[in-house]
Amino acid sequence: MSQDDEIVMRDVTSAGICIGDRIGREAASQLDLEEALEASRYASHPYSTHPREWPPLIEVGETWELPSVLIERYNTAGGEGTALCGIFPEIRRAWASVDNSLFLWRFDKRDGQCPEYSGEEQAICAVGLAKCRPGVFVEAIQYLLVLATPVELVLVGVCCTEGPDGRDPYAEISVQPLPDYTISSDGVTMTCVTCTNKGRIFMAGRDGHIYELLYTTGSGWNKRCRKVCLTAGVGSMISRWVVPNVFKFGAVDPVVEMVVDNERQILYARTEEMKLQAYVSGPNGEGPLKKVAEERNLLNQKDLSQGNRQSAVAGRSNKPSIVSISPLSMLESKWLHLVAALSDGRRMYLSTSSSGSGSTISFSGFNNHRQTPNCLKVVSTRPSPPLGVGVGLGFGAASVAGRTQNDDLSMKIETAYYSVGTLVLSDSSPPAMSSLLVVSRDSSVHSQAGSSSGPSSRSSRALREVVSSLPIEGRMLFVADVLPSPDTAATIQSLYSELEYCGVEVSGESYEKACGKLWARSDLSTQHILPRRKIVVFTTMGMMELVFNRPVDILRRLLESNSPRSLLEDFFTRFGVGEAAAMCLMLAARIINFEDLISNIVADKAAEAFEDPRIVGMPQFDGSSGLSNTRTATGGFSMGQVVQEAEPIFSGAHEGLCLCTSRLLFPLWELPVMSKKTSSDTMSEDGVVICRLSTSAMHVLESKIRSLEKFLRSRRNQRRGLYGCVAGLGDVTGSILYGTGSELGATERNMVRNLFGAYSNGGESANKRQRLPYSPAELAATEVRAMECIRQLLLRSAEALFLLQLLSQHHVARLVQELDANLKQALVQLTFHQLVCSEEGDQIATRLISAVMEYYTGSDGRGTVDDISPRLREGCPSYFKESDYKFYLAVERLERAALTSDAEEKENVAREAFSFLSKVPGSADLQTVCKRFEDLRFYEAVVCLPLQKAQALDPAGDAFNDQLDASIREHALAQRKQCYEIIANALRSLASPLASPTLDEASRSQYICQIVHLGVQSTDRAFREYLYKAMIELHLENELLEYGGPDLVPFLQNAGSHSESQVGAVSTGSSPLGHSGTQISSDQAKYFDLLAKYYVSKRQHVLAAHVFLRLAERRAISLGDSPTLERRRDDLSQAVLQAKNASNSDGLVGSAQGVSDSGLLDLLEGKLAVLQFQIKIRDKLEAIASNFESSVAMQDSDQNGQVLDGDSSDDTNLANAANEMAMEVSSELKSVTQLYNEYAVPFELWEICLEMLYFANYSGDADSSIIRETWARLIDQALSQGGIREACAVLKRVGSHIYPGDGVVLPLDVLCLHLERAALERSERIENVRDEDIAKALLAACKGAAEPVLNAYDRLLSNAAVVPSPNLRIRLLRSVLVVLREWAMSVLSDRMGSSPTRSSLILGGSFALENKAALNQGARDKIANAANRYMTEVRRLALPPNKTDGVYAGFKELDESLLSPFSF
């Protein structure tokens, strides 16, 4: 598509708004016939004359003589037999009967055929044609002839056969006798037969009753055909059975005419006495016939007769009578239902509803105005057309002038025919020759309709008709419309069937008959699609075809005949400049259907008239608009109001183009392009999606629209008309013609206002003086700009129709099968306006084209892209662009690659597809395409194509421009991320074995590495970050650390930190202690953890230690996001390990020195120790809470619902407090001071307190109260919980942990005395305390060192004030004996390399003397001296022998063993 023909959607949208408004006004301008008749009551001239200088409005097309065989038969009968005639337009046949013979012949062309049917013996008295009900006869029988004789009713089948070319379905007919479908008339002579569009047959008898003829296939005893009387009561039926009709002498008023309103399901009947009856047959036309109204005095309702009885009798011969009745279609009127033509030329319009009107026509809701018939009343009377006004062929005036003075100048109508707005009267008032008066709607007055109110508006809405008079030979017998051809009818039906404004509702009627109703509308709005109307008149002398010239036909004749310019100007004046220009445009573009082709001369003259400023005018400003806007409602001037700017009035050429375009698009614009077809035999409730319009209808409309667009383009290229006027404006031309400028308004509505006739100069509204914003040249350029927008709209509309035809040819139902439910619903609701003008319509069209391409490029091989793409590129290039062509070529290559087994060829074909797509990255459907590349394992395209599309979507890099608004940046980044997600999905597929079960691990790793390599090489910073996040999410940390780019560390730092300053502390290697305790979420922790692993892998141990420390000390953002203490311990342990590795590493310059200087290792180890205390405190608190809760539960079960005592309540409170403290201590790291003061001491965790005091290197006097009190509380706590054994166990556990100490943390004197006293007290009561328990516990606390324990006992025994009690002293001496023995055994075991247990056996066994030499002499002396000293001390005690002898003997035995001659 060249630049000149390129469609700018902004222009299309602007023109679409303008044309949409025009279409809305077109629909609103259509008046109901009742409103037009009401307005015409106040008009002085309801009839107009056709200009004599113009070509005739109605002309005789052809005349035919009656078939010779018919004339011969009639002459043979001597002119006295029974003869009837009529026309069956449904089968294109005229008919006539002579006695018992029926003749049928073609009335619209001469084919020489006139078949005769004479199967009856009696004369035919009534004839009718009915549609054949389905399922009764064979398919070949389409219609039934209904023949009534005085004695029988006969059905005859009619078979229609199409011609050789297949275009004429009624080329030949044959009649098929049906002998089983003949019944007796029961002596009733039928006067007329009428049939409904659903095949029901009604007959009127001379007895005044209405009958229905029913027929079925027949089964069993049932008759195949029967006659039912619908209007007679029970009494009348019995009377008929008993007394034959010939013996009834009462007055009978037979029905002479019946007509059916198939839209409202009403049957009207007219009797000889001018009585009208109305019957209804149910809402669907299949119910029983029911009389709803009967009116005898219709002529009196409108004062048709005046005066007394005598004058009425005297003037009885002049009283008008009803000549004919005809139903009015709903297209003509919703409130008027029947028109009756009178013998004096007047018309009565009747309604069957008692309610009034008062509604307007709209696009929808047409059926809502149907009301149940309940009466027959005259609503309006139309005066008779004046004699002599019709000048169709110039005979009317002459016929009036030829009458004598005594002749009655009133009309004498013999027969009348009314159909869709046209009335044909046979006037026998002329003395010499009868004439036909044809009354039709005058189209010219519609161009004068205004929007103002008052008398002028009423006059513009009044019904005006033009009268034409034609002479005829003989009498008019029957008139019928010549229906459009089947092809034309099918096209019109498809276009207008769902447009209720036009009322083309088939409802069982043939397309031809239903579409003929459009003639009721103005010729101006339908002449572009409807052919010339034709009627055929059956007279006693032959047949005559009358052709109605449309306004465009008259204009064509004027242009063909080289008429004076004044006639052309008169034509423009009569129809209005806009309407006349529209007709010129139709002729110039050749979009009107004619029987013959439009000559080039006529087309050129029409184009010249369309562009002639002397005829269509020039665009100008409304000089009175600014002034008129200053007037107030009262008619004066308001000095306080701002004078509005003058509005431009475009030329008639622009107005004509708008009218022509809106009428072409009218049946499409606001209606959906698709519909759902449902059938009873399908189980689906959704139905099948099909194109609403037929392919032939869309083709017809497309050709018309393309012809119009082609004409406008040629005038632009040739610089004709206004195009030539604006050609000299230089650079302004480009912006005017192609929309590249920015001066046309900020929004679409403003642009439409500027382009299509509502100007505002903006910014200067304070100036109250009227001003002209544009020069005449600029104003002309603006009109050209507006016309160019409409041209682009036409081109886009033609392309949309072409696309719809293509979709229909490929079966839309099949194409939409794969669409999701939401897209299907959007497609069904999509209007043509949206398809042409909206982005949504463009997207849906793209999706449908994609479905067509998938049909061709599918694996089953229906074709290639080049099989269908040329049609798309030529027919709808704005929907199928060059980029789309390359895209589908790539898709075709992908399909071929998928079917190729050779690996090298597969890769080459895939690379070809990648090459195509790389040229059009912005138009590719990446979701589908990249998935196909994934299946081919061609991951280069999977990575590169989304990155190219991301760049195409955001070429300026708005996502990274901090100078732009945040919403713009976010939108650009969101578009990029949609592309990135495709690459991430490919990674997910590879990372999940379930998604790719056939892929081995080696290949999986290879492809993942390939994607990562390609991604890291990208210059798109946002994508690399997105890739890193996706890899972390997929647990591809190892691959990320191995192949990550140089920006991986900054990415991890930024992702884990809240600010750049925090990242700087870590990245530079400095200690991040100033940031300890920073709030970090679990997601951020992932990045820090990965950063630490990265540092470890790169042997940057100091940085890794800092990151692990930061992870251990982090504070949670939310309560549930807090890491456990065990996790913190793991992180700190890792930090200690990395610090140790750094101190042992010689590879990093300055690392060991940095650790030595900062004491990082000591710091980390100290933090780890404090964390261990914290974990212990938490566990203790949880245990305390659990114990208290168990205690409370046991008390509750024991008390069985009694009120809790105070202790139970305290336990509950303690349990709650312990739980709260446990949760608090688990939330974050605490200092050793906090742990000691806030948790350990309040909950009496004395053991942990001692450990923390030892860890803190607590120093003080030996009598330090804190140490002593803590130990005392710990021992008391143990004693209360488990007695001496528990206290000894605690002493062993705690003492061994903190020994060796400086005597402050482990005060042996205090512990010894405290335990010995407790043991003495408890042994005297209930507890069994062994002598060695305390001594061995003290020895264990000192890690087996006996001397410190012995020294403690020495100090106690030497101070009588401290240990005054003999019992306590003997208790201490027993413990001393245990200490000395243990000391001796430990010395022996050290020398012999045996355990202390075995040493005790040796020392007291048979080998004691032999092994004593192994004892250390120094230790032996100390032990011996102590034993001698304590033996003396035992003797000094004032205690009974039974308490001292054993102790004394022990010391003595020990001493003797040490003093043996075999001593070492």
From Swiss-Prot:
A single GO BP: nucleocytoplasmic transport
**Gene3D superfamilies linked:** 1.20.58.1780, Nucleoporin, helical C-terminal domain (1.20.120.1880), Nucleoporin, helical domain, central subdomain (1.25.40.440), Nucleoporin, helical domain, N-terminal subdomain (1.25.40.450)
Q: Give the sites modified to N-acetylserine.
A: 2
Q: What does this protein do?
A: Major component of the nuclear pore complex (NPC).
Quaternary structure, from the entry: Part of the nuclear pore complex (NPC). The NPC has an eight-fold symmetrical structure comprising a central transport channel and two rings, the cytoplasmic and nuclear rings, to which eight filaments are attached. The cytoplasmic filaments have loose ends, while the nuclear filaments are joined in a distal ring, forming a nuclear basket. NPCs are highly dynamic in configuration and composition, and can be devided in 3 subcomplexes, the NUP62 subcomplex, the NUP107-160 subcomplex and the NUP93 subcomplex, containing approximately 30 different nucleoporin proteins.
What is its subcellular localisation? Nucleus, Nuclear pore complex
Family, as annotated = Belongs to the non-repetitive/WGA-negative nucleoporin family.
Gene Ontology MF term list: structural constituent of nuclear pore
Tell me where on the tree of life, at the top rank, the source sits.
Eukaryota
The organism is Arabidopsis thaliana
* Cysteine pairs bridged by disulfides in the record: none
Tell me which UniProt keywords the record has, alphabetically: Acetylation, mRNA transport, Nuclear pore complex, Nucleus, Protein transport, Translocation, Transport
The record ties this protein, via PANTHER family, to: NUCLEAR PORE COMPLEX PROTEIN NUP155
The gene that this protein is the product of is: NUP155
**Which protein are we looking at?**
Nuclear pore complex protein NUP155
- Where is it mainly found? nucleus
Which N-terminal residues, if any, form the signal peptide? none
Q: Name one GO cellular component term.
A: plasma membrane
